[in-house]
């Protein structure tokens, strides 16, 4: 990633892999755009038919499991937290899910945008509102909580 991209508030997959411990098949954010400091960001997930969840969910009519949409939201929020923490010894733990709603199915070929906005932060605890959108239409939403912990202190 170039310096210009960082100044514009973007993270490519290599930068995301530095921020998050997740790896295939559980890294659910391909790119992050429009990062506004620690206030908001948009994570991008390109949904493809060859992803392992579609083998069983559902073979005749593949639909992205809602829990994976929530996880994509949480990973986008986690990247915001990790950027703010800036310490290699820190991990971001997903703590809470509230008000989760699933509006429309997400299928292979869709490009999901995880719109994540910080609602509040107190110490190492963060609260976010998250919307998942496909082609501008709301497909899922949730309020999530996260906590930054030092992995050495566990």
Swiss-Prot record:
Organism field: Allorhizobium ampelinum (strain ATCC BAA-846 / DSM 112012 / S4) (Agrobacterium vitis (strain S4))
Keywords for the protein's UniProt record, in alphabetical order: Cytoplasm, Lipid A biosynthesis, Lipid biosynthesis, Lipid metabolism, Lyase
Upper lineage: Bacteria, Pseudomonadati, Pseudomonadota, Alphaproteobacteria, Hyphomicrobiales
GO molecular function: (3R)-hydroxyacyl-[acyl-carrier-protein] dehydratase activity
Protein's cellular compartments: Cytoplasm
A Pfam family hit: FabA
Record-level GO cellular component terms: cytoplasm; membrane
EC number of this enzyme: 4.2.1.59
Group of enzyme by EC: lyase
UniProt-recorded name of the protein: 3-hydroxyacyl-[acyl-carrier-protein] dehydratase FabZ
């Amino acid at each position: 990633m170039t310096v210009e991209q960082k100044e514009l508030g973007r993270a490519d997959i290599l930068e995301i892999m530095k921020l998050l411990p997740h790896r295939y098949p559980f890294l659910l954010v391909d790119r992050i755009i429009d990062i506004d400091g620690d206030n908001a960001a948009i994570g991008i997930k390109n949904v493809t038919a060859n992803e392992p969840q579609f083998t069983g969910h559902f073979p005749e009519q593949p639909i992205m499991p809602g829990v994976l949409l929530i996880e994509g939201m949480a990973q986008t929020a986690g990247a915001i937290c990790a950027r703010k923490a800036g310490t290699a010894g820190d991990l971001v733990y997903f703590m809470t899910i509230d008000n989760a709603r699933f509006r429309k199915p997400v299928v292979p070929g869709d490009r999901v945008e995880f719109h994540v906005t910080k609602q509040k932060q107190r110490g190492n605890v963060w609260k976010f509102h998250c919307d998942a959108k496909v082609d501008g239409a709301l497909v899922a939403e949730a309020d999530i909580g996260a906590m930054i912990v030092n992995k050495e202190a566990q």
